[in-house]
A protein has these predicted regions:
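Helix-turn-helix repeat elements of alpha-solenoid scaffolds
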Residues: 57-73, 102-113, 145-157, 193-209, ...
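N-terminal leader/linker segments that initiate helical-solenoid repeat arrays
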Residues: 22-92, 96
Length: 445
């Protein structure tokens, strides 16, 4: 049964209310400005007007959600609990709840929508994918990393059941989930987060093996995956050094995965540097022998190889790789622009190569007062530092801390900067000292 006139009318009312909320969010009382170098945040909205506007939005949103729920109940009463229309309605409700930072309620709505799709479309239907992505995003916003990880694995498992384990359509998802695990470890780095490194290494190894076997060993898609695999082995070497007793209880492999490429035994032999070096050399071979490879990708990969050597304590090898990045650009029209992007300012290491994430149709409209409040609640320290030609920080000046009077944040940032390495700035082909370099350091709760 389709929509009744009453249900349709209710949904039109909900849409008009939500449109009004979005319009008010898109035209805030005053703009929020974040300057381009991220060194200073200027909130141009007074707290009073921000609170008033936020309260008005909250009332309108609550009314819209209540009407949405009423429409869902009415449709269920008229068409039954498994009517396909309900899956779309509950998914839309989940998006609305998520947009308004009501993440636990959003997860419940997404799960109901996903269940309805399983009933109507089949257990392995990819129609569940948008709901799973909504669940993942909500768990991440809540800081529920284990739950987000489980949902990511369910997403991968669903694609494997649909396509099989050797289908090239798995490659972008393996890359995406591998990158998420790598970034999650980079942000957390606790003893028990070893699991994220294991998952990332398995996924990248699987994606590399599948790409090479199905698309060819010189396919350009391999380059970024090889570089991120190398970075994951660096983090593993670092984890082994920080937590030498962590290897006795590594945790189980996520379901739906099977190992490819490097074995666990090989990865535990202390050959992390050699494994990563082999990945970078493989990436460079692909770029050197592929006439379609962009020249800037070659320069960037040499720069990343330099970063890799710097992180492992081989400054001479790092300098050689940085010089090779300069050399491959000889005679290139955009040479100065590319070099400025790579070496025009110090870059904190390590750097993860970002990949585009598949859209889940879950959008976040700009200008929402909740977004402005989240910026107000953000914890950060603005600093001015001096970076030597060897990539070490020697001087740190605190410019601003938010929230104020938080010496523990300043201590964390200083400790992090002193222990970090930077790709140094280059001028006229040589690494040079950089003074008064400003940075914004985010400090997670």
């Amino acid at each position: 049964m389709g929509f009744s006139q009453n249900v349709l009318g209710t949904l039109l009312l909900v849409t008009s209310i939500l449109t009004g909320v979005a319009a008010s969010a898109d035209t805030p009382p005053a703009p929020l400005a974040i300057n381009s170098d991220d060194s200073v945040i200027d909130i141009n909205t007074t707290p009073a007007s921000l609170e008033l506007s936020s309260a008005q939005d909250s009332i309108a949103t609550n009314l819209a959600i209540q009407n949405y729920l009423s429409a869902i109940d009415q449709q269920e009463n008229e068409a039954g609990p498994y009517d396909p229309i309900l899956s779309e309605m509950t998914y839309g409700l989940g998006n609305t709840l998520q947009h308004n930072h009501r993440y636990e309620e959003a997860i419940a709505a997404y799960k109901r929508s996903m269940h309805l799709h399983r009933v109507n479309d089949g257990v392995y239907s990819l129609s569940q994918v948008p709901m799973l992505r909504g669940i993942i995003k909500s768990h991440i916003e809540l800081g529920s990393i284990n739950e987000a990880s489980q949902s990511y694995h369910q997403l991968l498992w669903l694609h494997m059941k649909t396509y099989g384990e050797n289908d090239v359509r798995l490659i972008p998802l393996m890359d995406e989930v591998g990158q998420w695990h790598l970034e999650t470890y980079a942000q957390m780095g606790r003893r028990d987060d070893l699991y994220h490194l294991q998952a990332s290494l398995r996924l990248y190894s699987s994606a590399i093996d599948l790409t090479a076997s199905q698309l060819g060993s010189t396919n350009l898609q391999l380059v970024d995956m090889l570089n991120n695999f190398a970075l994951a082995t660096y983090y593993r070497a670092l984890h082994e050094r920080l937590y030498p007793d962590a290897w006795g209880n590594p945790g189980g492999a996520p379901f739906g995965y099977r190992p490819f490429g490097f074995s666990e035994e090989t990865l535990r032999r202390g050959t992390h540097y050699l494994n990563g070096l082999a990945s970078y050399r493989n990436a460079l071979d692909i770029l050197e022998n592929n006439p379609d490879a962009p020249i800037q990708d070659k320069a960037e990969t040499y720069a990343q190889l330099g970063d890799w050597n710097l992180l492992f304590g081989y400054p001479d090898a790092a300098t050689e790789a940085y010089h090779q990045a300069h050399s491959v650009l000889g005679g290139v029209e955009q040479k100065d622009l590319i070099l400025d992007a790579l070496f025009g300012a110090p870059k904190m290491l390590p750097r993860i190569k970002k990949q585009p994430v598949v859209s889940s149709k879950v959008s976040k409209k700009p200008g929402n007062n909740n977004d402005r409040l989240s910026v107000l609640n953000e914890r950060y320290v603005n600093v001015s530092i001096e970076v030597t030609s060897e990539g070490r920080v020697t001087t740190i000046d605190i410019l601003k801390t938010h929230p104020e009077n938080a010496p523990e944040l300043e201590t964390r940032v200083k400790r992090s900067l002193h222990s970090s390495k930077f790709r140094p700035r280059f001028a006229d082909g040589h690494a040079v000292l950089t003074s008064d370099f400003t940075m914004k350091m985010l400090t997670p709760h």
